[in-house]
Structure formats: C-alpha cells, structure tokens
C-alpha cells in the first residue's frame, strides 16, 4: 500500500537511506565486537571496552533515527543482512582505533553520497536532516579518532604496552 504522507521523496533517496541504515548497523556490530574483545581477561583494557560499547550504541541510534525519518517521509524500511565484522581479534588498542577511524571515514563518505542523492532529487528536508544530525558529528568523531591514533603512536604503541595502558586509563577512562 502506498503511503499517504509521501511527498517529494524520491525512490533513490529511500533506497540510499536503507543502505545507510545497513551500514550504521554494521558499524554498531563492529564496535560491539571491539568492545567485548577489549573486555576479555587476556586483553583487559576497560577504557577501550567502554568507548567501543558507547560507539556501538551510538551507531545503532543513528540507524534507528534513519528508520524513524524513513517512516516520517512515507518511505519503506527494507532491512538487509548485516555483514559480520571484518575480524574477530582486534589486536592492540592502536590497531582497533585505526580500524575505527577507517570505519568512521567510510560511514562519512556514505553519508556524503546519501546527501548528494537527496540533493540531486531536490529533497531539502533530507539534506537538512543529514546536515543537522550526522555530518558535523562524523567530522568531529573522525578528528577525535585521528588525534588518538597520533597520540598512541607518539607514546610508542603498539610496541610499548605501557602506552596503551596509560591511554586506556587516562584518556578513555575519564
């Protein structure tokens, strides 16, 4: 049945939103894997575990916000299989943060692509929604992760285990 509320909402935008929902859920799933990796007794970095758990929850919230927007615009949500994370072992804190940085850059590029599709189809509502709720937050997250990668390298990670311990305790543990 066709939506009664659908207005100026192109099928391409609807499909791109569904793809973005899947990517946000994949990011959430990946961060959840990282969180419980760092919670293991043989890794034991609770600051990293807490940070990645929070990131997982945030990415899931992003997916849910897109689903709500899809419904408000009269679109239909078509969930797809969520791909498993690229790995099960995340190595050092530095390795995981580098993976997180790449993941955030991929999510950001996908959001920019979604914005472009919506812009090409003259959908100011969706463009405003993305600009307000996603794009600025992504840039800030990328910058923060980049800074942390730089600081861990400066401290001698991953060769220096004390660097990761102190980073976990003083940067992520606050």
Swiss-Prot record:
A GO CC annotation given for this chain: cytoplasm
Gene3D superfamilies reported for this sequence: 1.20.1260.10
GO molecular function: ferric iron binding; ferrous iron binding; ferroxidase activity
Pfam families found in the cross-reference section: Ferritin
Residues the record lists as binding Fe cation 2: 59, 104, 138
SUPFAM superfamilies, alphabetized: Ferritin-like (SSF47240)
Keyword Nucleus: no
UniProt: Fe cation 1 binding residues: 24, 59, 62
EC number: 1.16.3.1
Subunit structure of this chain's protein: In liver, forms a heteromer consisting of middle and heavy subunits. The functional molecule forms a roughly spherical shell with a diameter of 12 nm and contains a central cavity into which the insoluble mineral iron core is deposited.
Function: Stores iron in a soluble, non-toxic, readily available form. Important for iron homeostasis. Has ferroxidase activity. Iron is taken up in the ferrous form and deposited as ferric hydroxides after oxidation. Also plays a role in delivery of iron to cells. Mediates iron uptake in capsule cells of the developing kidney. Delivery to lysosomes is mediated by the cargo receptor NCOA4 for autophagic degradation and release of iron.
Protein name per UniProt: Ferritin, heavy subunit
Native source species: Trematomus newnesi
